[in-house]
Amino acid sequence: MKIEIDSKKVFINNGNNKEEIHPFWLRERINNEDALDKGNQQRLFDPNSINTNIDIEKIENEDGLLNLFFNDGTNYKIKEDQILNEYKSQNLDPITIEKVKWDSNFNDFKKFKFEKDIFESKAMHDLLVSFYKYGFVVLTNIPTKDNFIIKFANSIGSVRRTNFGEFFNVRSVPNPNDLAYTSLALSPHTDNPYRKPVPCVQLLHCITNNVSGGNSTLVDGYTVSEKIKEDYPEYYEILSSVKVKFKFIDKTVVLEDMSELIKLDEKNNFKQVRFSPRLDYAPILEKSKLDLFYKARNKISEAYNSDKYKVEFKLESGDGIPN
């Protein structure tokens, strides 16, 4: 890949194609002291104030450093490498950690122990890598006093306050505004599907667990989605294309969002799942399409609730699950 100059034009040649770089693209990257703040790299001018009929009048190539002269009287120097790096960055997929599928046989997952100096340690790096691989990690020994979980959460990213506050105590209360405040057993689901955006990382922190039972159950939405895609492609297609309404209402707030049960990214790769049968409302569609949708929703519900995909264990005081 290289930069080529032909007459008063700049081209990028990637080996297969040779494309002219728009002169305005080059003009708005002017880096003179009166045009660009050297500290924060923010422009000191509005590029929309530049005449769009911009052209290059002269180009001098000084051993990989282009000295550009434009028809509006400005000129500056830019390295060929800067142009090449911008081109490469816009055509590369971001570095990702490969997802690992798991089911009920996944019972030897590593547990990480919280230490007071964990925040900038290799252990934290390993914890985050494991999180991205499997979608969850188990962390032990997290302090249970003074809402320490908030401090821990802020070490990963900014805590997002919701209508429930910075944190949510799962307990039974009278006149609850959410089923998590009741003793009702909850089947596998994703939390807060009615938010936009939905939670990125949630932290479940066990303060005490002295009851019989009280197990935590996890299901991998990625594994289930991929299985649906493999065995029932027509179900996968409709679950990833039909948006349903998720809704939460109490005395002070109404929260709604529309989303697919299997959400894909712009390249049609798996991004996330939303699943909360007590909160979702299908749209009005043709009967045949809804027939297929309801069959697909039942099938994915069967999978989420199947023992085949569940990992179940009991959290002890101080244990936490980022998920």
Regions found by a protein language model. Name each.
Residues 1-119:
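Motif-centric detector for short Cys/His coordination patterns
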Residues 93-136, 141-142, 146-317:
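Active-site environment of non-heme Fe oxygenases that use a 2-His-1-carboxylate facial triad
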Residues 323:
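Active-site pocket scaffolds in enzymes
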